[in-house]
Amino acid sequence: MERINTTFYKTKVIPQLQQKYSYSNVHQIPKLRSIHLNRCLGAVSQKIFQKSSEEIAMISGQRPKITYAKKAIAGFQIRKGMPIGMTVTLRRERMYDFLTKFIHLILPRLKDFRGLNPTSFDGNGNYHMGLPDQLAFPEIDYDQIDQYRGMDISIITTAKTDEEAKFLLEALGMRFQ
């Protein structure tokens, strides 16, 4: 298991990208910009919200930012200004640490994992995926969770096309179907 960091990116990934796409400028070479973790809970009790916030903090290594409802939706029992979710943005070393853990520990632990879906790119070189539950993360203790809650993970790159982004992520170690 090789640790993904800026040195790995510069020594292993950049030469592969340069060889395949022949960039004329080093600033054209795609790189990771950030990783976003997002969890939406809706109308839940303060205790559940706090526990979920602690889980995201353990998974990401930093405290999440709370997101609030912009408008009231009676069908979902949500009022304006009510906390409904949380998000974390990882950059620099924390981003590379999370990506290393995600590729080498979390993805192999997912049930029936045969590779990531290659159609989950957004057309701008970013990759988005959802996890059904939090049990794949080694920081989460099975006995301490009360309900399975998934999360969305977005990997933001500077790639101009999905093809470049897919090649970048494959060079970093992600497997696609």
Curated annotation (Swiss-Prot):
Classification via InterPro entries: Ribosomal_uL5, Ribosomal_uL5_bac-type, Ribosomal_uL5_C, Ribosomal_uL5_dom_sf, Ribosomal_uL5_N
Annotated compartments: Plastid, Chloroplast
Function field: Binds 5S rRNA, forms part of the central protuberance of the 50S subunit.
An MF annotation (GO) of this entry: structural constituent of ribosome
Disulfide bonds: none
Membership in a protein family: Belongs to the universal ribosomal protein uL5 family.
Domain of life assignment: Eukaryota
Keywords: Chloroplast, Plastid, Ribonucleoprotein, Ribosomal protein, RNA-binding, rRNA-binding
Protein's UniProt name: Large ribosomal subunit protein uL5c
